[in-house]
Amino acid sequence: MLDALSKAAQLQRQAAAKGFDWPELDGVWAKVREELNELEQAGDDTAARYEELGDLLFAIVNLARHLKVEPTDAMIAANAKFERRFAYVEDAMAAACKTLCAENLAAMDAAWDQAKAEERERA
C-alpha cells in the first residue's frame, strides 16, 4: 500500500499519461495559489478546511511532480531538517537556562534563525 503522497503522485502521473495535465509550470503554480487561497477562505469551517487542505496538498504533490522532485523524499528531508534545527533550539534554550514555552518564543525563533544560518554556512 502506498503512502498518501506517493498515491497522489501516482494518480497524477496516470492522469498526465492520459493528457490531463498542466502544459506549463505556471498553471501548476496558479493551482497551488488557488488552493491556498481557498484554504484561507475556509475560515473556521472544519469540514471546508479539511477538504481544502487536502486539495492544497494534492496540488503541492503535482507541483513536485512537475519539478521532478519525489514528494515523499522531500518530506523526509524536511522532517530531518526540522529535527536538526529544533534540537539546536532545545540546546540553545537549555544553555541560556530558558524553558521551551510560548513566553520564550522570540528566543526560540532567534535560535531557529541561528540554526538556519549555521546550516547555510556549512553548505
Residue ranges and their predicted role:
Residues 1-53, 57-123:
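Flexible "arm" and connector segments at domain edges
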